[in-house]
Amino acid sequence: MAVANSSPVNPVVFFDVSIGGQEVGRMKIELFADVVPKTAENFRQFCTGEFRKDGVPIGYKGSTFHRVIKDFMIQGGDFVNGDGTGVASIYRGPFADENFKLRHSAPGLLSMANSGPSTNGCQFFITCSKCDWLDGKHVVFGKIIDGLLVMRKIENVPTGPNNKPKLPVVISQCGEM
């Protein structure tokens, strides 16, 4: 399946993003709970702050996009370490690849970042172009339905070593619509 058709039952979440302290806009993202419910729910709870550790909400608010590669993808979600090494999930540890039904067939698709088979956690990336070589390796679980320009603004931030943005790219606010 190239891209899932929108479904009224699927949750829609949002990221408000700032670059270098300046708000640049909002991305609205449909989560494909109808195709990959466990993966979508993990992401949704990190957007809303519903998941708590020791009574404290944990999730994407205040975290960064720590890796940006123009014409490929923008990666974020490491609210543990902020550098791409952190792993957390609502399932207490890394979780399995749910399925690979959806493909990396277009820009604006949300997919799980991982370090090999069944190592999903909190990190994700958003495709900036078709990335079919990732099919069967990373779980696609959502798509930007509004705010593709915000993704393009992030994609064009200057980067340094390890594709780290030279300006902080921060999820200043997030939640469910």
Swiss-Prot record:
Q: Which residues carry this modification: N-acetylalanine?
A: A2
Read off the Pfam families from this record. Pro_isomerase
GO MF, one example: cyclosporin A binding
Record entry for activity regulation: Inhibited by cyclosporin A.
| Keyword field | Acetylation, Chaperone, Cytoplasm, Isomerase, mRNA processing, mRNA splicing, Nucleus, Rotamase, Spliceosome
The record's EC number reads: 5.2.1.8
Gene Ontology cellular component terms for the protein in this record: cytoplasm; cytosol; intracellular membrane-bounded organelle; nuclear speck; nucleoplasm; spliceosomal complex; U4/U6 snRNP; U4/U6 x U5 tri-snRNP complex
User: Domain named PPIase cyclophilin-type: which ranges?
Assistant: 14-176
Q: Which InterPro entries match?
A: Cyclophilin-like_dom_sf, Cyclophilin-type_PPIase, Cyclophilin-type_PPIase_CS, Cyclophilin-type_PPIase_dom
List locations, semicolon-separated: Nucleus speckle; Cytoplasm
The catalysed reaction is: [protein]-peptidylproline (omega=180) = [protein]-peptidylproline (omega=0)
A GO biological-process term: protein folding
What functional role does this protein have?
PPIase that catalyzes the cis-trans isomerization of proline imidic peptide bonds in oligopeptides and may therefore assist protein folding. Participates in pre-mRNA splicing. May play a role in the assembly of the U4/U5/U6 tri-snRNP complex, one of the building blocks of the spliceosome. May act as a chaperone.
Give the protein family: Belongs to the cyclophilin-type PPIase family. PPIase H subfamily.
Q: Please describe the quaternary structure of this protein.
A: Interacts directly with PRPF4. Part of a heteromeric complex containing PPIH, PRPF3 and PRPF4 that is stable in the absence of RNA. Component of the U4/U6-U5 tri-snRNP complex composed of the U4, U6 and U5 snRNAs and at least PRPF3, PRPF4, PRPF6, PRPF8, PRPF31, SNRNP200, TXNL4A, SNRNP40, DDX23, CD2BP2, PPIH, SNU13, EFTUD2, SART1 and USP39. Heterodimer with PRPF18.
Q: What is this protein called?
A: Peptidyl-prolyl cis-trans isomerase H
The major lineage groups are: Eukaryota, Metazoa, Chordata, Craniata, Vertebrata
Q: Which gene encodes it?
A: PPIH
